[in-house]
Amino acid sequence: MILVRNIRLPLSAAEPQAFEKALHTLRVPRSKVEHTGVAKLSVDARHGQPKLVYTVAVTLKQPGEEAALAARCPDAVLHRRADFTLHAGTQPLAHRPVVCGLGPAGLFAALLLARQGYRPIVLERGPALDARVQAVEHFSATGQLDPNANIQFGEGGAGTFSDGKLTTRIGDELCDFVTEVFLQHGAPAEIAWKQKPHVGTDLLRGVITSIRKEIESLGGEVHFNTALTGLERKNGQLVGIATANGSFACETLVFAVGHSARDTFSMLMDSGLVLECKPFSVGFRAEHLQSEIEKSLYHEAAGHPALPRGEYQLSQHVGDRCVYTFCMCPGGQVVASASEEERVVTNGMSYHARSGKNANAAVVVSVGGADFANDPRRAIAFQRELEAKAYAAGRAAGAYAAPAENVQSFLEGRGQLHIGSVQPTYDRGVTAADLGALLPGELADTLRAGLRAYERKIAGYTAPDAILTGLETRTSSPVRLKREEDFVCTQLAGLYPCGEGAGYAGGIMSAAVDGLRVARAIISRYAPAEG
């Protein structure tokens, strides 16, 4: 297959025009072509005149001619499917492998192990998805939090209540495998070709449940409401684990807890394992009218039916730190994402249609090991302190209400909230607060500098009605559990740190890929347990 890139067309163009232009670029007659299709579609909104930019996949009737044809065209490349060959190991497992965590990393590790006959045992501290959705909705309506069933914990992990983005910067061939699995389990076909694919929280839930059911159909077991509470070791080798519901003998454990499993991190450190302090970020959720964002991005073309909902990704270096936007949710809402009592955490979520009035994105500033003397316990304590401050600042408006402030007020340190055209969407309600007072002064000032820079990139970013809601503290894991090149923990044989919580991923796609890598490492070393 040949990929013909940079096919630029006006918004009014249809797919057949892209196909014809691709064949013209290749200088190949249609009579020689077996198939054409869209491989990628993006929008170039620069210079105020948005264009559709296609990458077209072309398959010839004589595939042997494709290499020479692609070689003579600067905008073409020969695409060969990545080889995902698995080589089974010979060292017999005495016990079935255990996967701890059913977020993207654990889900895909368990799926690959199950497809190869390893019948994994999967432990998830939260409930199955239907019960989890009920718990989240109950918290949103009443402010009654279940610490093990919320937006952070339960089947699917934290990404289940998000925009369902499948974008990544890792460039791994396993991304195609992840996309195929999502498609096999009901994700919309467009994720295969959109430049910025997303599933949406509504559709993602069914996909996750379907993948879990495949794991079970292949002999895997899933134990919900079963938190990891301890490790059993002998001569530097993992030999078993303790959970809230009993013990399991195992010599391989995929440690794929999420970034909010603070009690589990503490258990590891208390048991003698050393965790590193890893960079993460803190800040707020910014809300604007989606229509205003699109006017700034698309100019006169805003509202054209060929254009996707407007998205942005901004960053600005301020001294030694970086202020950047994270998890931008077009047409979405800000959601209460606490997993601990009397702490407020914000996050963003949107449905597949992205039809809400507001755009939201985290606006955060980086912090790292030097801020905490490279002590992971201090980093976690910092997160908790900020979340407790946010809870106290919003408490007058109700349990888990959030502090909020207009962007202009934050820039001027006034602590005021005026509700105008932008209606805050945080589901537990908001109240006016001085957000700058909730953060260390240097971080607040750095965020202010970043926001001022954003106004130069997106007109209206600091508009009077724009709102900040706080605090955003769970952008990524604050810790990392070191592993070797074979993915085994440097401190304990048989323990496989994996995914976002262990410090090796950020987002659904990269976490899923890391789960596949870890599963592949186990498969290449061990033969399945008998019986």
What does each of the following model-derived ranges do?
Residues 1-50, 56-185, 189-531:
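Residues forming the flavin
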